[in-house]
Amino acid sequence: MSIDRKKLILEAATKSFTQFGYKATTMDLVAKLANVGKGTIYTFFKNKEELFDEIFTTLLKEMKQKADEAMEPSLPFHENVHRALFAILEFRKTHQLTIKIFQENAEIGTMAVQEVIQKMERSILSYIKSKIEDGIKSGAIKPCDPELTAFVMLKLYIALIFDWEKQHPPLDKETIAGLLELYVVKGLSAN
């Protein structure tokens, strides 16, 4: 029975954070949406931050799963990295909770929201880094600093998907894949 209540609380909190953002969500509101007493929430979660963190931990697992599902062993390394990165950023771009959190961060800059965004970025970087390490071990890519390479790849993707769209028409998936191959996989050398 208590697992059902915890699930109700998590669903209600997710709904509240998605609709109202982190700052405007209160434990009273979550209790009302979950149809439980406020005290029931505190039997599972110490505070709003812990509840928020649990929701985002689950969201990060979903994001990783989407990236894993996008990859196919028969494809070349760079194509799989592109597919995984695109899946991660598309998830981030279309998931209503992440949209709200990034919006709140831009408008208010709440500390808890900034921490969750940093956690999300670290998680994405760790995931990409592990794929780069796998690529180095398999000989698919030449030895490089996996952490730095993951950072560059992520920032390139963010720039192409989010920043470019601020002043230009959105790039399609194939164009982004081609640019990733040009700048990261092949490098800028003419050889």
Curated annotation (Swiss-Prot):
Residues 26-45 bind DNA. Pfam families: TetR_C_24 (PF17932), TetR_N (PF00440). Keywords: DNA-binding, Repressor, Transcription, Transcription regulation. InterPro entries: DNA-bd_HTH_TetR-type_CS, Homeodomain-like_sf, HTH-type_Tx_Regulator, HTH_TetR, KstR2_TetR_C, Tet_transcr_reg_TetR-rel_C_sf. GO terms for molecular function: DNA binding. PROSITE patterns: HTH_TETR_1, HTH_TETR_2. Residues 3-63 form the HTH tetR-type domain. This is Uncharacterized HTH-type transcriptional regulator YhgD. It comes from Bacillus subtilis (strain 168). The lineage of its organism: Bacteria, Bacillati, Bacillota, Bacilli, Bacillales. The gene is yhgD.
